[in-house]
Amino acid sequence: LTTVQTDGSMGYYSIMVARKDSGMTKVTDIKGKKLGFADPDSTSGYLIPTVTLPDALGGKPVKDYVASTGFGGGHENLVLEVLKGTFDAGTTFGSGVGNFKDGYTSGNLRKMVDKGILNMSDLVELWKSPLIPNGPLVIRSNISDATKAKITAFFKALPTKDAACFSAIEGGEYKGYADVNVNFYKPIIDARKATIGG
C-alpha cells in the first residue's frame, strides 16, 4: 500500500528552499553557493536531488555547480540551518499539493508549520523535483494471506474509521491508501542503483 494525496496523486517532491531575503528565486541561483542536503540516506533530501538536479543546472553535476555541499542532519534541521544561514539553500520534501505558503498539504514543511517552528513567508521555493513515489506500507511475505488481507483491510478503512489516527500516522492531509507493487518503485530503485552501482 501507499498513501494517496488529496488530489489523487501517489507521490511527493524534493523541494529546494532558500531564505526569502537571499535574493535567490530560481534553482540556477545556487551557483557558487552553499547547498545543504537533509541526510545521505534520504530519497527526497539527497538521492533524487543528486540524480535530477544536473538537468536543471545545464547538465553540470551539483558538486561542480555550487561552492560546497553538506548535510543538515535530517529534514527539519536542514530547513532550520537554511534559516540560520549555515546553507544558502537546501533540499527537503513536500506533497506539492496545495499552497507553498501553507507548507503544502503534507511533508516536512507542513509538519514544521503545524509545530509552529516555521513561517513559510521566510522561505522561497527554488526547485521541485519530478514526482517521487510515496513510501510503502509493507507486510512480510511469509505472513498468511488471511492475515495480510486483514491488515490491508484495516489500513484501507483507517481514513474513515479513525481519521485522527490516520492523520497522525501519515503527518498531513491524505485521502487514503492504494495498492501498489514493486514496479511502482522502479524509478527509485534505478536511481539508487545509479548512485551506488548494481
Give the label of every model feature segment.
Residues 1-24:
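Short, glycine-/small- and polar/acidic-enriched structural segments
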Residues 8, 27-29, 127-131:
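Short, flexible turn/loop "capping" segments at secondary-structure junctions
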Residues 13, 27, 50, 76-79, ...:
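Extracytoplasmic/secreted envelope proteins and their assembly/folding machinery
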Residues 18-39:
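Flexible hinge/capping segments at coil-to-helix
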Residues 34-144:
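Pocket-lining segment of extracytoplasmic ligand-binding domains
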Residues 108, 139-198:
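An extracytoplasmic/periplasmic, membrane-proximal ligand-sensing/linker region
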